[in-house]
């Protein structure tokens, strides 16, 4: 088995903030939702390797009432430490809460945690250089 996607949620009309975080901040590509699901709201994002294969997929669904996931979270792997730092800096520039306090607390990795526009926690990590 392998993981196909993870889903996080946002409040109604939270898609634009999701796009700022997942597309503009993390650098993922927004992909169209299947027509049968498009009416539910939300948006989907993917990352691809150089050969065009999907390497990560995050679905942002609309939930009402909404409660952010402040602890449970997806973790995305950056290419290297420079990429990790670049993504973290971009999220800060975009105004998203980002913390490096646990940068060296996971043996063999460097990482940061950020919170999307709805308050959901996301981890970005890379093998320590």
Q: Which functions belong to the PLM regions below?
A:
Residues 3-4, 39-44, 55, 102, ...:
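Amphipathic alpha-helical "stalk" segments
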Residues 35-38, 64-66, 103-107:
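A short beta-turn/loop motif at secondary-structure boundaries
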């Amino acid at each position: 088995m392998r993981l196909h996607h993870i889903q996080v949620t946002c409040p109604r009309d939270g898609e634009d903030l999701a796009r700022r975080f997942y597309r503009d901040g993390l650098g993922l590509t927004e992909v169209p939702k299947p027509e049968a699901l498009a009416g539910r709201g939300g948006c989907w994002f993917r990352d691809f390797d150089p050969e065009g294969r999907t390497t990560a997929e995050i679905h942002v669904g609309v939930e009402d009432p909404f409660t952010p996931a402040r602890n449970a979270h997806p973790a995305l792997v950056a290419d290297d430490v420079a990429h990790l730092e670049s993504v973290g800096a971009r999220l800060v520039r975009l105004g998203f809460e980002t913390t490096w306090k646990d940068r060296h607390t996971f043996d063999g990795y460097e990482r940061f945690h950020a919170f999307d526009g709805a308050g959901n926690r996301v981890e970005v990590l890379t093998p320590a250089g």
